């Protein structure tokens, strides 16, 4: 990236994994600095995806990274699966929630037939909050059958929440169409 040449007045610290220093050790040292931005060149392996999520959660004001997912849902799925494969999480929904919390925007670039890169779309990630909408009316029910009906209502809500794994929604806020950028969801 040659950031020292582009930003000569900035205090830039570069780290790279070696045979004797792991990427996790680099991240642990970086967390102790007062850095503002983390740039992770290529999130192509499961451990690097895990480091990126960690860095975005606690190590800086924001984190930039590259990835080759074709769609936003593919990006979330790939990062979630990396978190599961590295053993950071064992629950699919929890892993996805953590990924979604750090993905604010996806700036998706493509290359045209001439080899020129351009931004195809900018997508915003909106985490969905889990609503606690259980019905506590069973306490007021007079009969056993009425209490049982309320119990089954709450059980239905619980199992719907457990099986509906939607943790986010996403919207394209800018798209490239016919040579122009168009605001689609300002």
Residue ranges and their predicted role:
Residues 2-5, 92-96, 105-110, 151-163, ...:
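Intrinsically disordered, low-complexity boundary segments flanking structured domains
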Residues 3-19, 114-131:
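C-terminal lobe/lid and adjacent interdomain/linker elements of RecA-like ASCE P-loop ATPase modules
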Residues 118-186:
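NTP-binding/hydrolysis catalytic cores, primarily Walker-type P-loop NTPases
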Residues 9, 21, 49, 105, ...:
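A generic structural micro-environment signature
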Residues 51-54, 83, 96-121, 125-127:
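Helical/strand "switch-coupling" subdomains that flank nucleotide/phosphate-binding cores, especially
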Residues 1-100:
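Switch/coupling sub-region of P-loop NTPases
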Residues 13-15, 55, 79, 111, ...:
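Generic alpha-helix signal with a bias toward terminal, lower-confidence helices
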């Amino acid at each position: 990236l040659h950031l020292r040449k582009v930003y000569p007045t900035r205090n830039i610290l570069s780290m790279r994994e070696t045979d004797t220093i792991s990427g996790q050790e680099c991240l642990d040292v970086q967390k102790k600095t007062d850095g503002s931005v983390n740039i992770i060149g290529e999130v192509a392996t499961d451990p690097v995806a895990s480091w990126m999520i960690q860095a975005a959660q606690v190590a800086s004001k924001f984190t930039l990274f590259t990835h080759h997912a074709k769609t936003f849902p593919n990006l979330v799925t790939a990062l979630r699966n990396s978190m599961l494969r590295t053993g950071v999480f064992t629950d699919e929904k929890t892993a996805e929630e953590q990924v979604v919390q750090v993905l604010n925007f996806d700036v998706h670039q493509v290359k045209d037939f001439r080899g020129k890169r351009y931004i195809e779309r900018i997508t915003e990630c909106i985490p969905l909050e889990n609503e606690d909408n259980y019905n506590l009316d069973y306490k007021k029910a007079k009969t056993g059958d009425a209490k049982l009906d309320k119990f089954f209502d709450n059980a239905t809500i619980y199992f719907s929440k457990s099986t509906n794994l939607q943790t986010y929604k996403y919207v394209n806020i800018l798209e490239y169409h016919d040579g122009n950028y168009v605001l689609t969801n300002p």
